Each structure stands twice: as C-alpha cells, then as structure tokens.
C-alpha cells in the first residue's frame, strides 16, 4: 500500500510540474534565497531543520530502537538507518514538489501549513485523467499512512508493557487505546470548553502546549539520553554500541577516533543546543532575536 502511495506521488509530481505557473513554484522550492536566510537568522534556520529531523524520524522516543530490535541479526543497522533517512527525505522532497508548485499554479499562499494538501491536490486531481479514482486512492493511502505512523509511535509503549511487564499484546494495546483517548481529551477540548486556557498567551491553546512539550522537550531530551547511554561507560558504552551496529552483513560504521569523538562529545552538545534554543526561543524571544538575527 505504501508502494502504491509512493507511485501516485511520483505521478502527481510529474503532473504538477506541467501546470501553468508551476515553474515559479519550482524556483521558489528549489532555489535557495540566502539573503532571506540571513534576514531570518541562520541559527533559526538550522534549528528549525534539526527540529524537523527530530520530528520526522521520531528521534528520542524509542520508535526506531524498537523496530531495529525486530529485524534479523544478519541485517546491517547502518544500511537500514541510511535507507530510512534516504527514503524519508525522498518522500518529503516529493511532497514539496507536489504542493509548492501547485500553490503557485492555483494562486494559493504556500505558507498556509499542512492543510494545503487538502486544498491543492483536489485541484490537481481534477485536471488528471481518472482524477477522481486517483484522488480517492491517494487520500485513502494517506489515511493508512497516518494510521501506520500512529502504530509506529506507540509501538514502543506497547513493547514496554510486553517486555517488562509480561502483558499480552492485545491487553497492552487496549490499555494504550484507553490512555490515548483520555490523554487526548484536553487537546480536543482546547478548541471549545478549554479555549480560555492559553498557556503561551493570546491565540495559543492546549495543542500548542502539547506540541511544545513533545517537539521541544521530549524529543531532544530523549535523543540526548540515547546518545549519552550509547557512548558513556556509565551506560552501554561505545564498544558495545559499535559491536551491535556493525553486526550482520552489509555496510559498516567506520570505527575511527574522529567518529568516536564526534559521537561522544560533539553530538550530545548539538542535541543539548537544540533543546536549550527551543526554550530560549519560547520564553526569552527578545534575547533569542538579538542572538540569531
């Protein structure tokens, strides 16, 4: 099913770039504007890119770790990690290749956010042969992709109950469904009954608070914990880490002093910087702007 979704995305990208006005969208999407980057703040751009990497790859919450534990020992973890990163980047690139040029073709503002997929794509499908069929299939596959993402995110919680508590999968899933429903209520009520609760000032809501806690707190702190655990002798240690990463057949992670130094000292520092900048940006915006602009 995901292969079919990928195939439809390729067809959509081909169709979109042939629309009138799509060329300007391609320029907007593919040609970097370094002047605007400097005006916005290079530090802010880098921070936003790193934050997106945390989010899109589910770093810091153990999802990749759990799925990595499910693959056979003969597989190369290095190769699988590069494959996941490459495929994720390719899909994101294709999505941009579809949405941004379509915005220019249909005179839409490209900065409107995720909802653009439901605005631009129906227009694209309307101009394609068998567009209704392709559109129905695309949004159906998108729904299943979203569901599979939800399953992936909560697999580590389900696995926790199964591995450490000996709970059956069916019971662990049922417990998590109940917990998700209860914990999701404040977010849902934040747009009506709890709309008066504005944690970050006027215009903010419960969803903004939860997004900040996950994106700016749990993901970077979780990633920092994993990095320190894998590289510190108080945790797993680099020797055990390299042994596990380079087990199996295929691509190996180079075991040299430069990479070891990077993993042990530079990488934790970068993750810590992402965490600190997220809080400074939220709670000390004037100081943040003076530094990064």
Protein language model regions, located:
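Flexible glycine/proline-rich, aromatic-decorated loop/lid segments
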Residues: 99, 110-118, 195-200, 204, ...
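Hydrophobic alpha-helical segments of multi-pass membrane transport proteins
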Residues: 147-152, 173-187, 191, 208-243, ...
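A generic transmembrane alpha-helix motif of multi-pass inner-membrane proteins
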Residues: 199-228, 252-293
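Transmembrane alpha-helical segments in integral membrane proteins
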Residues: 58-73, 144-159, 223-241, 275, ...
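Alpha-helical transmembrane segments
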Residues: 153-167, 202, 206, 228-256
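Membrane-embedded translocation segments of transport machinery
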Residues: 2-147, 151, 165, 171-175, ...
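Membrane-interface segments at loop-to-transmembrane junctions
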Residues: 79-87, 249-261
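Hydrophobic alpha-helical segments and their helix-loop junctions in multi-pass secondary transporters
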Residues: 6-32, 101, 105, 186-192, ...
């Amino acid at each position: 099913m995901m292969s079919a979704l990928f195939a439809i995305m390729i067809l959509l990208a081909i169709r979109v770039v042939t629309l009138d006005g799509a060329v300007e969208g391609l320029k907007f999407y593919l040609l970097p504007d370094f002047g605007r980057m400097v005006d916005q703040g290079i530090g802010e751009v880098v921070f936003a890119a790193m934050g997106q990497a945390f989010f899109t790859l589910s770093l810091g919450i153990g999802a990749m770790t759990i799925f990595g534990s499910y693959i056979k020992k003969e597989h190369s973890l290095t190769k699988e990690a590069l494959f996941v990163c490459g495929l994720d980047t390719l899909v994101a690139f294709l999505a941009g290749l579809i949405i941004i040029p379509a915005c220019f073709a249909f005179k839409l503002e490209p900065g409107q956010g995720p909802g653009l997929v439901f605005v631009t794509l129906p227009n694209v499908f309307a101009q394609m042969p068998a567009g209704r069929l392709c559109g129905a299939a695309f949004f159906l596959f998108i729904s299943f992709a979203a569901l599979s993402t939800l399953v992936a995110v909560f697999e580590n919680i389900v696995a926790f109950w199964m591995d450490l508590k000996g709970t059956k999968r069916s019971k662990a899933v049922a417990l998590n469904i109940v917990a998700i429903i209860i914990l999701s209520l404040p977010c849902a009520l934040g747009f009506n009954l709890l709309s008066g609760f504005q944690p970050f000032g006027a215009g903010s809501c419960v969803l903004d608070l939860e997004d900040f806690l996950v994106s700016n707190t749990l993901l970077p702190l979780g990633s920092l914990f994993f990095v320190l655990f894998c590289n510190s002798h108080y945790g797993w240690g680099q020797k055990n880490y390299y042994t596990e990463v380079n087990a199996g057949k295929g691509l190996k992670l180079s075991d040299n002093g430069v990479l070891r130094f990077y993993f042990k000292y530079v990488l934790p520092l970068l993750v810590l910087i992402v965490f600190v900048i997220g809080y400074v940006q939220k709670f000390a915006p004037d100081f943040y702007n003076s530094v990064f602009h």
